[in-house]
Amino acid sequence: PMHEAFLRLEVEGFLQLYPRRGALIVPISPQEIHEVYEARLLVDRHCAEKICAMPDAERADIADQLDATIAEQDTALDGADLHAYTHLDARFHQIIMDGGANSLLAGLGHQLRERQQRFTATAIGRNVARARTFVDQHRTLADALRTGDLDAYLSTLDTHLTNSRNQL
């Protein structure tokens, strides 16, 4: 099982394996960061377009799920539990990816989030205030999806991803 895990990590670009010598964690390049954020923007935009085109009741259901996740994020941050916050952040974005009604894009979105977490995990560090800024942006994103305001969503998403990238 360990060998298979290492092979998977190598295929995903996280490790470089050296037979009979060991493994090396592949450093994160500026190009990888750029490509992950660019791909996230494309996938997220597509999902938001699909959600904003849905009937009000369907959009409201997705927004309700997002609001519930935001409430959990607030609770986690009130307790300075950044580990829980990180998982809830992933859930928030996955709800949007799943709402795009394309399982391939939702899977790609999940993979991109995992790659992004590789370089953002240390960026938030122990900074609850920084995490609260992201939660405030989540509120704006959820509100834009609830009302079907794609322009507001995309503007906030651009700020959200730019702020995340600038933390690196």
List each model region and its residues.
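Hydrophobic alpha-helical segments typical of transmembrane helices
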Residues: 1, 32, 92, 130, ...
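Conserved amphipathic alpha-helical segments that form helical-bundle/coiled-coil interaction surfaces
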Residues: 36, 58-121, 136-140, 152-162
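Short, charged helix-to-loop "capping" segments that act as catalytic/coupling loops
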Residues: 51-65, 125-129
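Short linear motifs at protein or domain termini
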Residues: 1-53, 104, 165-166
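Mobile beta-alpha loop/short-helix "lid" or hinge segments that flank ligand
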Residues: 11-16, 110-115, 129-132
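Short, flexible turn/loop "capping" segments at secondary-structure junctions
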Residues: 17-18, 89, 133-134
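Short acidic-aromatic low-complexity motifs
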Residues: 145-148
